[in-house]
Structure formats: structure tokens, C-alpha cells
Amino acid sequence: MARGRPLEIEAELLEAFRRSGRVSEYLVTILPQKLWRMSPPGGRGRTIAAIVAHMQSVRRIFARMGGARPGPPPLDRRTVTPARARKALRQSTNQLASLFERAFQTDRARVKGMPRRAVDMLIYLVQHDAHHRGQMCTLARDLGHEFATDDMTRLWGWKALPPDL
């Protein structure tokens, strides 16, 4: 006899997708603003602001491919602020989650316009964000930032994110 909540694949995938989006927002909020535009040691690579702008750009492309209009806002790597980035990431997470949710509710294998099946696309976007969150954490450390243990456990999902995320 099964115990606990029954398995609901589509709902749990959407929940994990939204949680991944909130983790990206959380990272943006905990990074010191002084690191936001600092060049990587050695001068090669993206700044943290540029990484976040890139993440949003990819999300925006796929949201628009899937029919979101006007789609999530673009971010300019030269002028984006952490507050603006957090808001834009929230919008893109919500718009993409809505596209995936509609596909799941209608038993469609794809979000029309996206290049991959819905589950594959959702997982790709989670992986893409996770990869770039890792880059941001590594860059922050390389620039001298030490993450608090609580922050790291929240980023890794072992501790709940703050309720406003």
C-alpha cells in the first residue's frame, strides 16, 4: 500500500521547474552587488550580470518560441541590476511553466513551436540554469566571496528557500 502523496509526474515536474527558477532568483539576491560586474580573474569570460542576462535570453527565446507574447523581458548585460534580473527571471519562469502546464493538461507531447518534446525542453532549461548557477558560484568564489552555509544548503535544496521566493 502506497504511503504519502500519490505520484503526479506532470505536477511534480512543474513544481521542480518552478523551484529551479526560484533558486536562480535566490542566487541573484544573495550575491553581493559589488561582484555583479566584476571581470573574471584573468579577464576572460562573462561577468555575473552577463551570465544572468544570458540565462534570461535563453528562457526568453524558448518562451517566445512556445507562443508567449510579448514574452519575458530581455536583460542587457551592461545595465541589468540584481532587482531587475530577479523580476525578469520570475516572469520567464512563470511564462515557461504556464506553457509546459498547458501542454501537460492537454496531453500534448510538445509545446508548439519549441524544438523538443515538453519534458525534454523543461529538463533542458533546468540543466541550463543549474550550469550557469554553478558558473556564478565559482566566479563569486574566485572573486573572493564566501557563501554562508545556509545559502549553500538553500541553493542545493536541502533547506527551504525564503517564503518570498
Region spans (language model):
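Acidic catalytic patch
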Residues: F100-P115
